[in-house]
């Protein structure tokens, strides 16, 4: 009789402490503690994030194991985010994973955070509509720290076709939200306001970058200069037009993302297209995916909202596949704040 494989996944790359347990690749539990402390600072404060991870990691892991209905001694391996991310945050998860695995005498599995996002569609949470994309497929990975188009041939065979040469789409949204005085994180706020606004009300600069690479620094600069000019003319401009501003900003960013993705589909002839990362929760981007599916015959794969942001389930599913291939890491494996994709 084949022994069941239980993987504990741990994610701590930024400001979410998360732990998940998977049994034979099926998700049993996924527990996440988010950090509201950063909101008043307008962004993640690394030192505060690290301290919060230290407070949260033990109870979060214990709760994940409890909800999974197993004993820790049943675990087969511990998978953890090795990078990229904030070094102080990563070290908390990395060191806990090492100590926990060593105490149980089980293997360690290091996981690239970006690889985890790419594999989010392979998280089987027991849903009736579980439908992972067939290989190969294209994945738009878009978050606060990354904007990439990835060709996925297998969990351990991915090719970056294009990526941002400066700022990420999620970072641009957060910075523009801050300029408007809307608070942090900006993504959900811009998304909510955009649903009530006119996406063609204002025009912002779009980059002209060859190939499949992205750039969002010019958009941020254009947005800032326009806001300054309009506020000088009318101090209440943002308050009176925030819905239209948000809708126009969202439309511009989505348009930039989709133009490059459409080009990638044309170049590769791959029409199975997925989206992942925190920005994939954006309503405008999701609508654009459905629209392109109808217009161009794509088959699109959009993750559950709970799998769009940082979570340990995505680390656990990569860990499961690596366990099957016996791809374990050494106890001395360091964390990396910056790391190549795979």
Regions found by a protein language model. Give the residues of each.
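A contiguous, well-structured pocket-lining segment that forms one wall/lid of small-molecule binding clefts
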Residues: 192-273, 282-296, 323-326
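Glycine-rich phosphate-binding/hydrolytic loop that grips phosphoryl groups
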Residues: 117-119, 303-342
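Short beta-strand scaffold segments in enzyme catalytic cores
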Residues: 17-22, 139, 147-151
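Short Gly/Thr/Asp-enriched flexible loops that form oxyanion-binding sites at enzyme active sites
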Residues: 80-105, 123-124, 283-292
């Amino acid at each position: 009789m084949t022994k069941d494989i239980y993987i504990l996944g741990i994610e701590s790359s930024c400001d979410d402490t998360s732990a998940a347990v998977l049994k034979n690749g099926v998700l049993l539990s996924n527990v996440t503690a988010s950090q509201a402390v950063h909101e008043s600072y307008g962004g993640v404060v690394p030192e505060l994030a690290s301290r919060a991870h230290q407070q949260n990691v033990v109870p979060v892991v214990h709760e994940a194991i409890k909800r999974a209905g197993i004993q820790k001694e049943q675990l087969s391996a511990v998978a953890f985010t090795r990078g990229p991310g904030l070094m102080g945050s990563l070290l908390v998860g990395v060191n806990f994973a090492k100590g926990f695995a060593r105490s149980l005498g089980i293997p360690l599995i290091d996981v690239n955070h970006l690889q985890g996002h790419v594999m989010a569609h392979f998280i089987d949470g027991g849903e009736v509509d579980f439908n992972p994309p067939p290989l190969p497929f294209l994945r738009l990975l878009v978050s606060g720290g990354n904007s990439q188009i990835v060709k996925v041939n297998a969990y351990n065979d991915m090719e970056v076709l294009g990526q941002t040469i400066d700022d990420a789409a999620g970072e641009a949204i957060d910075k523009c939200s801050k300029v408007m005085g809307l608070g942090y994180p900006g993504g959900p706020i811009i998304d909510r306001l955009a649903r009530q606004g006119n996406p063609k009300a204002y025009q912002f600069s779009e980059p002209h970058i060859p190939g499949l690479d992205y750039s969002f620094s010019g958009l941020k600069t254009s947005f800032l200069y326009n806001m300054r000019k309009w506020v000088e003319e009318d101090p209440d401009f943002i308050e009176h037009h925030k819905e239209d501003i948000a809708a126009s900003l969202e439309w511009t960013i989505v348009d930039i993302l989709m133009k490059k993705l459409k080009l990638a589909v044309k170049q590769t002839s791959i029409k199975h297209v997925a989206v992942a990362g925190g920005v994939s929760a954006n309503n405008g981007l999701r609508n654009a995916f459905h629209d392109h599916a109808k217009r161009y015959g794509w088959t699109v794969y959009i993750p559950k909202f709970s799998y769009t942001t940082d979570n340990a389930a995505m680390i656990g599913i990569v860990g499961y596949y690596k366990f099957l291939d016996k791809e374990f890491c050494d106890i001395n494996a360091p964390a990396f704040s910056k790391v190549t994709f795979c």
